[in-house]
């Protein structure tokens, strides 16, 4: 199963990246995350808390290319695993394409898929929250033509 969201943000990739890698600031702008413990950087294991969920997610950050992409992975390979990628594509000096995609796999997936929430609305909220905050920062700093 794969869930994907894509949005164009009227802000530089560096602004978007700054939001995506500021663990302490996430709850301020992101309605889908109530807290992240740890630092969002290569090789780090995070503790992520989401509203309404009675568990803590512990993804490991990998594949980091600053202001371009990263991946968060959680679970056991071949058993049940989630891999979430974040990709930023600068479009000129004032716009950034953002794609977030999560792929679930493993032998246990068929058994647990009915217990998973509908990620579509969650991903849409995440992308819209990111867009709103990045564009607010860009307007405030004069880093956009909007």
Where are these regions (language model features)?
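Hydrophobic ligand-binding cavity/cleft-lining segments
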Residues: 1-37, 41, 146
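Short capping/connector residues at structural and topological boundaries
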Residues: 6, 38-41, 85, 109, ...
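A conserved amphipathic terminal alpha-helix motif
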Residues: 103-146
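Hydrophobic-ligand binding "helix-grip"
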Residues: 37, 49-97, 103-108, 132, ...
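Secreted/surface-exposed cysteine- and glycine-rich disulfide frameworks
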Residues: 43-46
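Conserved short-loop catalytic and cofactor-binding motifs
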Residues: 4, 49, 114, 118
């Amino acid at each position: 199963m794969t869930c994907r969201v894509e949005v164009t943000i009227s802000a530089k990739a560096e602004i978007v990246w700054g939001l995506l890698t500021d663990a302490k600031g996430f709850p301020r702008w992101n309605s889908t995350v109530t807290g992240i413990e740890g630092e969002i950087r290569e090789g780090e294991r995070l503790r992520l808390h989401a509203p309404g969920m009675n568990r803590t997610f512990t993804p490991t950050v990998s594949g980091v290319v600053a202001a371009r992409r990263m991946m968060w992975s959680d679970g056991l390979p071949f058993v049940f695993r989630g891999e979430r990628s974040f990709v930023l594509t600068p479009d000129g000096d004032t716009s950034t394409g953002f794609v977030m995609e999560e792929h679930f796999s493993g032998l246990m997936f068929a058994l647990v898929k009915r217990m998973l929430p509908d990620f579509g609305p969650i991903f849409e909220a995440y992308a819209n929250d990111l867009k709103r905050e990045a564009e607010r920062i860009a307007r405030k700093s004069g880093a956009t033509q909007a």
